[in-house]
Amino acid sequence: MSKLKQKSEFNIDAANLLIKEAYYASSIHCSYYSCFQLMKFTINDFFGIDYEAQSVEISTSGQHTHQYVINFVSNELKRFVGIGESQSFKRTIKDLKQLREESDYENIEVSLDMSQTALDKANGIRQYLIKNFNV
């Protein structure tokens, strides 16, 4: 198994455990990164773009790593399943990313509700990637 895919699975498992222990901010971080890592793995495994080539593409694209990965997957979804599903996917991952940024960087209390929302979004994204890209 790919190390990145394995990290993705570890992170979703960690998100669940962290919620049970009331470490809500950390759980959101893990929920998001489980999806980000699975998207990078999908680009490698399904689309055949190895990690080194991804790094080169990112550095020449003028985009940040997370922006590039999200845009790549959503653009490919547009081709495979249509604009509606692509937009829905992109909106969900961006919502999850926003939760992660607020949780990591803002001086706020992170609640059970926020962490559960992040986990639900992450599980949906992961299931979607696994189903549609056989990863």
Q: How would you describe each model-predicted region?
A:
Residues M1-V135:
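Terminal alpha-helical segments
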